[in-house]
From Swiss-Prot:
The gene is gatB. One of its GO terms (biological process) is glutaminyl-tRNAGln biosynthesis via transamidation. One of its GO terms (molecular function) is asparaginyl-tRNA synthase (glutamine-hydrolyzing) activity. Transmembrane segments: none annotated. This is Aspartyl/glutamyl-tRNA(Asn/Gln) amidotransferase subunit B. Keywords: ATP-binding, Ligase, Nucleotide-binding, Protein biosynthesis.
Length: 476
């Protein structure tokens, strides 16, 4: 029996506000444990939450960016549960009236585009963090408690691990463009749970789902889904049944393990938050927030293809992160050719960032010095090979491209007389290569070009070398 996988993703994104959603405590990452707290975060008796307007507006902006309808009337609710990192014994969230509903984003997998529906986007507060020690006790840090979150719940429209990966990449890109979050999974500002079920191909009814947690990277989301697909298929093929449960992805083994039997929403005993009034959002407020949304990646891709003549793949890669796209645009503004700038950013720059595990802002590269280097290549001042040395110097130490070329003595040798002298000496020492060339062995030319480049430390003008080399060999 063959099965179809049905996946829905729940993504939590921390909003980049200065203070928490219901208190005045700072909301930044990395502080000493239990220092970013107030009596509100600690759930002390008699204290009242105060709603952070900026968090609401960030939620509206994110919802609009993923094509959600913004509610005219929304409210907050108490989600009741006890856990050490939740001092109030309830979480303030949104239950039946979320701030955004009925959205969608478009993904592309294997050259095919597909719309993934968004059920809802709602606001809530984050919980604290437990650290379990090997000494039989746990440590609780309340710093994260009360940090504003949006939870984005997809429709069960995702059919594979690859589609889930593409959805997360696209969602991260869109949220990053809006500026409402850093969406850094390594810092916990973007987290994902996956709901996975399988059903026989052709069956309309959904299978029993399991919720998968501890997915701390996009790769782990993919691996967790792939494992869970196989596990559920094996259970059904052996005559077993799938239990509705929450499972943990174990990165060390690549497998999932049982955490607990899955709770339903009734288990949380939701009821309206009595300490916060309902929120009404009028059209004027919506339009003001909508006007603040910048050009999003899909529109930039279209502009890069239509206005700059870039291939669709280049446009997609360049717009995947706002930092890369903004850097590209600034490089063009500094005078670089669009295709050359695209090639460098997608090639050498991306390879360097991956190898060094850095972001663009962590390097010495600027749009101005990258554009300056590209213009030196176009002017024939340096070759593409020498440019790689210049690029590495700029990436590591910054500076001006032209000055680096001068200081390092990297100017391309384009003097015909000098090149003829060098080539003449090389031919004198490689008579067999001349004979091979005249006998039709083209690789002899490549060998001689390599000798010229070696003698000039890669600084000879390649087209001139080829031209002069052929002329000199044909004379002999």
């Amino acid at each position: 029996m063959n099965f179809e996988t049905v996946i829905g993703l729940e993504v939590h994104v921390e909003l980049k506000t200065n203070s928490k959603i219901f208190s005045s405590a700072p909301a930044h990452f990395g502080a000493e444990p239990n220092t970013n707290t107030t009596v509100v975060d600690l759930g002390m008796p008699g204290v009242l939450p105060v709603l952070n307007k900026r968090a609401v507006e960030y939620g509206m902006k994110a919802a609009m960016a993923i094509n959600c309808e913004i509610a005219e009337h929304t409210k907050f609710d108490r989600k009741n549960y006890f856990y050490p990192d939740n001092p109030k014994a309830y979480q303030i969230s949104q239950f039946d009236k979320p701030i955004g509903e009925h959205g969608w984003i478009e993904i592309e997998v294997g050259g095919k585009k597909k719309k993934i529906g968004i059920t809802r986007l709602h606001l809530e507060e984050d919980a604290g963090k437990n650290t379990h020690t090997s000494h039989g006790y746990s440590l609780v840090d309340i710093n994260r408690q009360g940090t504003p979150l949006i939870e984005i719940v997809s429709e069960p429209d995702i059919r594979s691990a690859e589609e889930a990966y593409a959805y997360l990449e696209k969602l991260k890109s869109i949220i990053q463009y809006t500026g409402v979050s850093d969406v850094k999974m390594e810092e916990g500002s973007m987290r994902c749970d996956a709901n996975i079920s399988i059903r026989p191909i052709g069956q309309e009814e959904f299978g029993v789902k399991t919720e998968l947690k501890n997915l701390n990277s996009f790769n782990n989301v993919r691996k967790g889904i792939e494992y869970e697909e196989k596990r559920q298929a094996e259970v059904l093929k052996s005559g077993g049944i799938i239990e509705q449960e929450t499972r943990r992805f174990e990165e060390a083994t690549g497998k999932t393990s049982l955490m607990r039997i899955k709770e339903g929403s009734d288990d949380y005993r939701y009821f309206p938050e009595p300490d916060l009034v309902d929120l009404f959002i009028d059209d004027a407020w919506k339009e003001r927030i909508r006007a603040e949304i910048p050009e999003l990646p899909d529109k930039r891709q279209i502009r890069y293809i239509n206005d700059l003549g870039l291939p669709a793949y280049d446009a997609m890669v360049l717009t995947l992160t706002k930092e890369m796209s903004d850097f590209f645009e600034a490089t063009l503004a500094a005078g670089a050719d669009a295709k050359q700038a695209s090639n460098w950013l997608m090639g050498e720059v991306s390879a360097y960032l991956n190898a060094e595990q850095k972001e663009l802002h962590d390097t010495g590269l600027t749009p101005e010095n990258l554009a300056g280097m590209i213009k030196l290549i176009e002017a024939g001042t340096i070759s593409s090979k020498i440019a790689k040395k210049v690029f590495r110097e700029l990436a590591q130490n910054g500076g001006d491209a032209e000055q680096v070329v001068k200081d390092k003595g990297l100017v391309q040798i384009s003097d015909e007389g000098a090149l003829r002298t060098i080539i003449g000496e090389i031919l004198d020492n490689n008579e067999q290569s001349i004979i091979d060339y005249k006998n039709g062995k083209d690789r002899a030319v490549g060998f001689l070009v390599g000798q010229v480049m070696k003698a000039t430390k890669g600084q000879a003008n390649p087209p001139m070398v080829n031209k002069i080399l052929l002329e000199e060999m044909n004379k002999r």
